[in-house]
Amino acid sequence: MCKTNRSGKSAVLTQEQLELFLGQLPEKYSVLAEVMYFTAGRVKEICTLKVRSINFQDGLLTIEKASTKTKETRQVPLPRTVLEHLRSWIHSKELGPDDYIFYTDSKNTSYRPGEKAISTQSVDQFFRKTFDWIGVTGASTHSFRRTRLTYLHLVEKWSLAEIMDISGHKNLL
């Protein structure tokens, strides 16, 4: 697997790598990866999202302080396409407001859908295997965050203050 020594920084993905990666994933992981990318969220922040975290009308996702590294709640806008993918996923699984959007569905557990959040380790392992499968080295769950923030800064010309706000960074050191 890539990055076995866990040193260095996660790779920043090209648009082609991102599209190739998303095309290899089953629905749950594809929607999860889209949310990770467009929110520039950390894997734990996204794995612990509940249905009530999404304001479909305003197009906002609330990342609760309990799951953030900085212990501060933040709101992040989501594109309509991602909101529709989330709506479809939630509806197809019949999830309620207090259910986890991305949940464990192991055959070895007795949890009902939405009852227990998917583990960050499960997502990390699945994503690393997929990156290896498509030949992308040095990538991990954190690559979505780095890729999005890099894109917003270099392509969309966001200021560092805006980058810090969406990412939940308190400083850039």
Give the ranges of each region predicted by the language model.
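DNA breakage-rejoining catalytic core of tyrosine-based enzymes
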Residues: M1-L18, K69-R80, L95-D99
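A short, glycine-centered helix-capping/turn motif at helix boundaries
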Residues: L25-P26, V35-T48, V155-S159, S167-H169
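Short, polar N-cap/turn motifs at the start of nucleic acid-interacting alpha helices
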Residues: S53-F56, K157-L173
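C-terminal catalytic core of Y-nucleophile DNA break-rejoin enzymes
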Residues: T68-S88, D99-R128
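Short basic/aromatic active-site micro-motif
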Residues: T137-V155
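Short, leucine-enriched amphipathic alpha-helices that occur as contiguous helical runs
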Residues: L18, Y29-S30, T120, D124, ...
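Basic, Lys/Arg- and aromatic-enriched nucleic-acid-binding interface segment
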Residues: C2, A11-V43
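Conserved tyrosine-mediated DNA breakage-rejoining catalytic core shared by Y-recombinases
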Residues: T39, T48-V82
